């Protein structure tokens, strides 16, 4: 087997930059080590922290990373059958082990090897500002408490998420490739969606466009198709042949090298209702308002409240509208979503109410008209935005206008 697999990888310089940044934060908290529970849930979003320091992840791989303040990182994956593959897929971590007995036993064993069984150990996966439920199973946590009774296990809260909020040049390069995959997916929908073609056939063609050009699974891809679809795309396509004047609304998180972008569009097989065009025009007006108000040093909340003013002035209502950070996960920092305002006002307090150069986020605007069909149908639009030194730049190139297809 080849010693190096043809997969996206970042440089050792990038690894060293990340290791230094994380260890600075660890020192400030007095942490001897951190354990990052890379649990493949919610399209692999919960593997982001461990993958950030290892490049191990994808296709629902478990990656529990033990990262000491001094010494070598250790990645624990689920099965020994994938050890050689992960050693060939990346060069950041050489100590890769399979789970032995239980996850708690596997982690405790490495902590004891490091002679940190009485140390202060930070962990993600516990309840924190971005996830009030956490994702670490109770029995795993209890097992660690039992196996490491002298250790001080503490929650990391959003320590890693803050470090990940501003992207490096290498990360931006990977995200641009992910955005290109999104453009290909939209072009595939444009070229294949026709009356009589099954929804699932178009969906499959769009997925082929992503994976066939180097993209990675799993990723979020939501879809709905109907004369008057739900206000928000659903989870799965149906086997129904599409009909004239059907509206397609889709949300994709195109993924490359573990990095997600976010793009949404509305298509119609034929001529849409004038109300649908009016709603979509509202999406574009809100989008332009955001671009005009995003930029380094500018207040996040002010920009997003201006977006809401545009929506309100047009008599439209929000299904979803706002921004959320993108990188190795979705729903990263920065976040300010009008449909989850209480949580995200707190997020602004945590990370600050200013855009910074290098931030990348989804800007989605999914709207309805409450006076039409009771607000139960609408249009969607979203793109991934990069904050540059001089303003805001869209990462996608696919046309923004309403997509009329052959009916």
Predicted ranges, named:
Residues 1-407:
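Active-site neighborhoods and metal-handling regions in enzymes and metal-associated proteins
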């Amino acid at each position: 087997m080849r010693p190096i697999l043809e997969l996206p990888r970042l440089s050792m310089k990038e690894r060293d930059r990340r290791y230094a940044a994380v260890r600075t934060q660890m020192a400030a908290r007095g942490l001897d080590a951190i354990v990052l529970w890379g649990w493949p849930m919610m399209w692999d979003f919960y593997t982001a922290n461990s993958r950030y320091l290892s490049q191990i992840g994808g296709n629902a791989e478990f990656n529990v990373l033990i990262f000491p303040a001094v010494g070598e990182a250790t990645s624990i994956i689920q099965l020994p059958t994938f050890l050689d593959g992960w050693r060939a897929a990346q060069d950041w971590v050489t100590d890769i082990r399979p789970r032995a007995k239980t996850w708690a036993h596997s982690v405790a064993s490495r902590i004891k090897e490091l002679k940190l069984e009485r140390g202060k150990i930070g962990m993600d996966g516990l309840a924190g500002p971005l996830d009030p439920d956490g994702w670490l199973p109770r029995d795993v946590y209890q097992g660690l408490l039992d196996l490491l009774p002298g250790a001080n296990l503490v929650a990391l809260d959003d320590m890693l998420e803050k470090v990940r909020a501003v992207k490096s040049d290498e990360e931006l390069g990977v995200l641009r490739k992910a955005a290109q995959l999104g453009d290909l997916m939209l072009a595939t929908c444009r070229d294949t969606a026709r009356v009589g073609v099954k929804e699932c056939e178009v969906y499959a063609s769009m997925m082929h466009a992503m994976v066939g050009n180097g993209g990675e699974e799993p990723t979020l891809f939501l879809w709905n198709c109907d004369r008057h679809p739900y206000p928000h795309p659903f989870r799965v396509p149906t086997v129904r042949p599409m009909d004239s004047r059907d509206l397609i609304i889709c949300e994709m998180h195109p993924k490359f090298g573990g990095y997600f972008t976010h793009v949404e569009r509305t298509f119609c097989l034929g001529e849409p209702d004038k109300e649908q065009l009016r709603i979509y025009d509202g999406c574009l007006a809100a989008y332009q308002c955001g671009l005009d108000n995003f930029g380094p040093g500018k207040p996040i909340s002010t920009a997003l409240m201006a977006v809401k003013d545009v929506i309100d002035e047009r008599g439209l209502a929000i299904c979803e509208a706002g921004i959320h950070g993108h990188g190795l996960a979705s729903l990263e920092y920065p976040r300010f979503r009008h449909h989850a305002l209480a949580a995200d006002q707190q997020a602004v307090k945590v990370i600050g109410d200013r855009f910074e150069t290098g931030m990348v986020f989804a800007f989605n605007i999914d709207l309805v008209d409450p006076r039409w069909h009771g607000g139960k149908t609408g249009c969607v639009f979203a793109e991934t935005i990069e904050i540059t030194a001089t303003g805001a730049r869209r990462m996608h190139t696919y046309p923004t206008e309403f997509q009329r297809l052959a009916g």
